[in-house]
Amino acid sequence: MESLNALLQGMGLMHLGAGQAIMLLVSLLLLWLAIAKKFEPLLLLPIGFGGLLSNIPEAGMALTALESLLAHHDAGQLAVIAAKLNCAPDVHAIKEALALALPSVQGQMENLAVDMGYTPGVLALFYKVAIGSGVAPLVIFMGVGAMTDFGPLLANPRTLLLGAAAQFGIFATVLGALTLNYFGLISFTLPQAAAIGIIGGADGPTAIYLSGKLAPELLGAIAVAAYSYMALVPLIQPPIMKALTSETERKIRMVQLRTVSKREKILFPVVLLMLVALLLPDAAPLLGMFCFGNLMRESGVVERLSDTVQNGLINIVTIFLGLSVGAKLVADKFLQPQTLGILLLGVIAFGIGTAAGVLMAKLLNLCSKNKINPLIGSAGVSAVPMAARVSNKVGLESDPQNFLLMHAMGPNVAGVIGSAIAAGVMLKYVLAM
């Protein structure tokens, strides 16, 4: 009987909590959205599966060595950790002390847990290498750069303003998060508000990179919100676009884009990086990888490297990035009031970014002979190329012969640049406070 009881107690099912059960259902929902609805499947599928692995009771796949020690509840070991932190020897007090401790002290406690025989789970290791170091989002950005054509942007430089205007959603969302905190509705610190705001850029890698730096505790919710809303762009944007434009404006036919020379395409990423990085060094990592990837594409002399970055490398990193995000979908971190606030602010951010891009296009039309179809302003959010396709689709509904796709790619690419710069601004000024 004792052996049978020990066997039963060793089953994960016996230790399944309500929070873990809910998160298992959330993870299954993400898998269903990825497989059945094809909502950003390249990221939501590994994120969902990572969420499943993270919430299997007793497996500890997403726990660091220190978290495994705390979950083990050994009184002697807790006393050693508590003595180092000068707090009461119980799990809750230790967690509070760790939250207030310096990163160097947290690292010392992690090493102490390793010395006591605990090891981090595989997903925790993935997270440390892929996101904790910031490497995975940067490599993804390199791949995106290698797949990006700056031609439409260079052919119509005014569209850069549309991409810039769409970033207004980012900063409006930061203010929204701080407003919720001010009125005591949902508690958000300034770094957390900045990390949430980047959802408005509709740029998954940038959202993961920034939240990993500013608010790693919210990374799971921010990543899920960012990629879910990116997949919902065809549903979120059209009503806003139609509400802000007239039938006549939607029928505007734009002048055919000029041919951009190879020299321009080669010089642009180099000049862009130098201008932005010299003014805002904190944007250099993201923008640097993006421009490097694009230079490999446009130079034409490293086709093997360009092909590897666009295909094999970005696919491999995407797998580990998704599983690493899934490591943050543990119940005690995800099932918080903050998650609801993130989901609400995320959709508002998308809406504001879309509206700002459309309104900027209308403003430019007031002082220009060559009219811009305001619909392409919505492509200023950097969901590439989905936002551009939505602009084209809504335009075709008003005029079946008015193809806006290539025109919309200009602000779409500008949005990627804008979100990277916005992330640099957040890092520079938020971390300095």
Curated annotation (Swiss-Prot):
GO terms for cellular component: plasma membrane. Its main location: membrane. GO terms for biological process: sodium ion transport. InterPro entries: OadB_MmdB. It is a multi-pass membrane protein. Keywords: Cell membrane, Ion transport, Membrane, Sodium, Sodium transport, Translocase, Transmembrane, Transmembrane helix, Transport. It is found in: Cell membrane. GO terms for molecular function: decarboxylation-driven active transmembrane transporter activity; lyase activity. Its EC number is 7.2.4.2. The chain crosses the membrane at residues 16-36, 42-62, 122-142, 160-180, 216-236, 266-286, 311-331, 340-360, 413-433. Pfam families: OAD_beta. It catalyses: oxaloacetate + 2 Na(+)(in) + H(+) = pyruvate + 2 Na(+)(out) + CO2. It comes from the Bacteria. Its cofactor is Na(+). Heterotrimer of an alpha, a beta and a gamma subunit. Belongs to the GcdB/MmdB/OadB family. Catalyzes the decarboxylation of oxaloacetate coupled to Na(+) translocation. NCBIfam families: Na_pump_decarbB, PRK15475.1, PRK15476.1, PRK15477.1. This is Oxaloacetate decarboxylase beta chain 1. It comes from Salmonella typhimurium (strain LT2 / SGSC1412 / ATCC 700720). The gene is oadB1.
